[in-house]
Amino acid sequence: MMQPKKTKFRKAHKGRIHGVASSGATLAFGQFGLKAMEPERVTARQIEAARRALTRHMKRAGRVWIRIFPDVPVSKKPAEVRMGSGKGAPELWVARVKPGRVMFEIDGVNQQIAREALTLAAAKLPIKTRFVARIAE
């Protein structure tokens, strides 16, 4: 599971995801990618599930780049605990994803396999996505 080795603070505010992605909105490494179409918090488990779906469908051929990283801690209080008495303990890590952000990139496979693999990966994510391809140069 992905998570930061060290953070400045143990807990973070919930926050909101405003605007569209300015950085990370275009393909940087691979020929094909999966782009987010709506704002959402994506957990480390969801990223890992999508990565596994990608690599299994590609049968270890090609290369995968994960362009998002879960760096925001989400805290949770234990079950059946009354409100108050402070914020809960960090439970999981999430990545705040803005619309337009390229989340995954792949290379080394043909377009049909890339589209199938990224569709399988998209099914593991709580977000509407779009398949993007680099324009033939």
Curated annotation (Swiss-Prot):
Keyword terms of this UniProt record: Ribonucleoprotein, Ribosomal protein, RNA-binding, rRNA-binding, tRNA-binding
Keyword Ribosomal protein: yes
Molecular function per GO: rRNA binding; structural constituent of ribosome; tRNA binding
Example of a GO biological process term: translation
Residue spans crossing the bilayer: none
Gene Ontology annotations for the cellular component aspect, listed alphabetically: cytosolic large ribosomal subunit
Key word Ribonucleoprotein present: yes
CDD domains, alphabetized: Ribosomal_L16_L10e
InterPro entries xref list: Ribosomal_uL16 (IPR047873), Ribosomal_uL16_bact-type (IPR000114), Ribosomal_uL16_CS (IPR020798), Ribosomal_uL16_dom (IPR016180), Ribosomal_uL16_sf (IPR036920)
Coiled-coil spans in chain: none
Pfam families, sorted: Ribosomal_L16 (PF00252)
Role description: Binds 23S rRNA and is also seen to make contacts with the A and possibly P site tRNAs.
Subunit structure of this chain's protein: Part of the 50S ribosomal subunit.
PANTHER family: 50S/60S RIBOSOMAL PROTEIN L16, LARGE RIBOSOMAL SUBUNIT PROTEIN UL16M
Entry similarity comment: Belongs to the universal ribosomal protein uL16 family.
This protein's name: Large ribosomal subunit protein uL16
Organism per entry: Rhodopseudomonas palustris (strain BisB5)
